[in-house]
Amino acid sequence: MPLRLINFRQQRRCRQSPSVARLESIVLNRRELLLDHFQYSLFQNSSEIPMTTILINDRPMRHTHDGRADMTNFEMDLFDTRIEVPTSKNSGGDGMHSPYYDEESSKKRCCKCGNSRNRIIKPACVPISIVSLFIIALVFLPLFNEEDLASPIKLTTGCSVDCKTFLVESIPIGLPFKTNNHTAEAWINIIDNSKQYLDISVMYWNLNTSDYKSSVYGRRVYEAIIRAGKRGVKIRIAQDGASNLSDNKESAYLVQEGLAEVREINVTRLIGSGIIHTKFILSDIATLYIGSANMDWKSLSEVKEVGVVFQECPCVASDLYKIFAAYWKLGENDSVIPEKWPISYRTPFNFSSMAKLTMDGEPAEYFISSSPGPFNPKGREHDLAAIQKIMKDARKSVCISVMDYIPSTLYMKKSNRFWPEIDDSIRDAAYRGVNVRMLISHWDHSRKEMIPFLKSLQTITDGLPRYNRTEHGQVQVRIFTVPPNGKEKIPFTRVNHAKYMVTEDIAYIGTSNWSGDYFISTAGVAMVVRQPSATKRLQNVFDRDWNSEYSKDL
């Protein structure tokens, strides 16, 4: 007995227009005809049976090589029939229409199906609609969470301009080193050229004093900030709120005179310990400074500092602005760290995906790293991870200049612990054949335990594997000491306060000392650039200091 297609839809069909009923009749008849042919071909030897041709719409249905019917024409005819079916001209139609685009027919099929036993489609519409709305909300609602990042100027991620950069330094009075770009002059230039906005992240304030002759640079910078506020530049300052290193009278005066808005970030309240150790200036979301210098006159004339300036570079400035915006948000009263930072705070730029730009006429790549982890939205490279990856990427040379180097935490009281993350990366680099040179500061406040840790790094050289019989990695350590400035003794001065690293490919300039606390619970940032010219400039500074009379073997 021939197989017959059971039309379940016909048993539960809603009331339909004649055109739709006719469509179902056509489809049913054609399916029955096709199945009869399938059954005949299935149970008979196709090689012994004469070829039979089935006509559909007066066209022959072809067969495949094994005698089965070719479905192509049938499916296309069925599709064509479903798209256009005859209609009654008495009802105002032109003789052909598509029930799938007939709004009235759709309503009848989906919403008015007669008595309850015929309601097939309507109940399904409800859960499908709910699921669809849920998916839409899940995917698109986060995209509307942009109001949390208030930006006075449209941020950009595309670097279409040639960014000008300057390596800037503070050279303590009495050191014979020369620099083309002094930190104080760079700051004053940035501030004086600000037209609308000036955002500053600072640990503490100590610019405006006349107690010492060398404090003139500090006063000049502070006067530049006052001038900017008076000419209408909107100044915002995000400063540490828990360290008690200064009474911050200078920022308080700016607020009192209506020249600036200040917010304090209490890192200890937010994550249990830590401070804002970041130092950067951002002008008009276009020009910026990142470096080791504090807003302290000593950092401009009595302490050795290193930083970098990006001039008229909106893409880099926009990325730094997101970090400032996070600080600004955390400076609100009763603020909490978001469980998940809004999308608008995210960055696409990190070690795995550096931003491409033109820097001083040459191709370059960059990203900005930050710590601690809870302050970082998605995409932002943690400062520690940046250091580790840069060392892992090095093939020939790693040169490090930092004030403090201790593989432990220092400020967690009874909870201090061994912290070997950077120490292990240094050893790993040397083991792979990289020449590691470390220039560490020595001054009145250096910790005694630092020297044994440095010696332990240096002594591994003799145990490192040799490559090509003669070549092998090594760790060399030198101590850099800034001599006193005559008879004048100024507290917390005469030290190399720089925090940078340079390899054969990458220049890293940061704001953090190299001990555990600065990456676990202290806020800091770093600029990372991959460009031959940038690395050469920073390498020249390192080599100058390394080979100077102020550098001694450990």
Swiss-Prot record:
Membrane topology: Single-pass type II membrane protein
Keywords per UniProt: Glycoprotein, Hydrolase, Lipid degradation, Lipid metabolism, Membrane, Repeat, Signal-anchor, Transmembrane, Transmembrane helix
Entry annotation: catalytic residues: 277, 279, 284
Pfam families, per the entry: PLDc_3 (PF13918)
Origin: domain of life: Eukaryota
Catalytic reaction annotation: a 1,2-diacyl-sn-glycero-3-phosphocholine + H2O = a 1,2-diacyl-sn-glycero-3-phosphate + choline + H(+)
TM regions (residue ranges): 124-144
Enzyme class: hydrolase
Sequence similarity: Belongs to the phospholipase D family.
Protein name (database record): Probable phospholipase D F09G2.8
Native organism: Caenorhabditis elegans
